[in-house]
Amino acid sequence: PIHQRYLLSLQDMDRSKHLAEMIEAGVTTFKIEGRLKDRDYVTNIVAYYRQQLDQLIDSNPMLQHASTPSVYRYDFIPNPAKTFHRGATDYFLHGRTPNMANWDTPKSTGEKIGKVVAIKHNAICVELAPGITLHNGDGICYQDKGFAINRIEGDWIFPNIQVSRIGNRVIGT
């Protein structure tokens, strides 16, 4: 029912795939929306766009930095799905876009990290997707509620809440 949906849970504006065409159209300044976002989100998104813009500048001799480029150093791989993320849309860049909101949850959905394959007492076993590593303190969206990880032992995750269903998709945030 519509009264149980999140009608104002908009997806994140992501125009990173359109940077080249925006530069070609004459755009010289990009604003990163970070209102009400935490430091990790802003750091990740700015680093991601910096990386995308640097690749465009390096591959096109007609482009140059507007000022002396600084050396940007970060000890992570920028990825918008790794911090608060409800899906991405370019909104109205090329006309009306379907599915600009995530009506099912106001929470960050992150990326799919695996599937619950077993539950034992106060822990769950997740079959992780290739390349996924979890750490104590990571956030996970499980079913609709999600939980924080108290402890990791191999494939076993000890959440801070009781879980009860096997087979659910697990999404890391």
What are the language-model segments listed below?
Residues 1-173:
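Surface-exposed amphipathic alpha-helical tracts and adjacent flexible/coil segments at the periphery
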